[in-house]
């Protein structure tokens, strides 16, 4: 059981890294495909239109496609045409062509749509800001005393009690929704009147925390506990040792 993970990274492959596959090998062998490449328009490893019409056509029926890099990496029109004809791909779309003036036609053929917020967690923003702060301090030879952890505010929900008889799937659903109710973003996105509302969604995006901000309680199965820890959640083995940082909620 589990996943067989394939990774395609052409620049790293050229640098000699082992264990990577070509893009076409990955597309041919994968039932779940996650794209999070930057957009580069020139050079040997240009990513613009990387998933072109030919590759879109070649995707196996039932493929789950997560687009979380840049919109122009995928031929979105080819995806739309395939979905209009067959509607046989499971689409999770976070990035779009011509942001912020996007075409909303693909909404009706997607399982989940979000306004380019894959990197919008508070931790992600704070991490980037702290890196700039550290670089400035180093440049001006200033002493840095503040750590990133010391600057992070306490989460609104710090702990979540999981039913002791919950399955792995139930545990994952409860924990993920406890940090990030994904379908609320989807509902806001689908409420757009037109593509021009996209920028407003990003500017008014609510605070979102990462998995590491939430500690899980009550998991009785060691395998599930290890799985959730691997996803980045805090997992309390002994409830007597929990350090309370905020309210405890139970789903």
Positions of predicted regions on the chain:
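Rossmann-like adenosine-cofactor binding region
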Residues: 12-104
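C-terminal accessory region of SF2 helicases/translocases
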Residues: 228-230, 237-251
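Short, flexible coil/linker elements and helix-boundary hinge sites characteristic
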Residues: 5-8, 30, 141, 232
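Short, well-ordered beta-strand core segments
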Residues: 5, 33, 111-113
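NAD(P)-binding Rossmann-fold cofactor-contacting core
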Residues: 1-17
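Short, well-ordered alpha-helical segments in soluble proteins
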Residues: 2, 34-37, 140
């Amino acid at each position: 059981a589990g996943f067989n993970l394939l990774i395609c990274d052409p620049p790293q492959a050229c640098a000699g890294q082992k264990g990577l596959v070509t893009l076409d090998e990955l597309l041919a062998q994968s039932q779940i495909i996650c794209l999070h490449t930057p957009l580069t328009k020139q050079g040997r490893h240009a990513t613009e239109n990387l998933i072109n019409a030919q590759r879109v056509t070649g995707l196996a029926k039932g493929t789950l496609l997560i687009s979380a890099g840049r919109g122009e990496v995928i031929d979105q029109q080819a995806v739309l045409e395939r979905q209009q004809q067959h509607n046989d791909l499971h689409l999770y779309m976070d990035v779009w062509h011509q942001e912020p003036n996007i075409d909303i036609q693909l909404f009706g053929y997607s399982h989940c749509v979000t306004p380019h917020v894959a990197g919008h967690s508070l931790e992600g923003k704070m991490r980037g800001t702290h890196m700039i702060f550290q670089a400035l301090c180093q440049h001006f030879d200033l002493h840095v005393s503040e750590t990133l952890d010391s600057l992070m505010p306490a989460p609104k929900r710090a702990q979540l009690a999981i039913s002791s008889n919950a399955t792995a799937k139930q545990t994952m659903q409860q924990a993920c929704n406890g940090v990030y109710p994904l379908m609320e973003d989807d509902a806001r996105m689908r409420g757009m009147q037109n593509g021009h509302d996209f920028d407003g969604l990003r500017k008014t995006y609510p605070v979102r925390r990462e998995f590491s901000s939430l500690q899980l309680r009550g998991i009785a199965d060691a395998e599930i506990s290890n799985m959730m820890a691997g996803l980045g959640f805090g997992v309390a083995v002994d409830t007597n040792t929990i350090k309370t940082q905020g309210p405890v909620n139970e789903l």
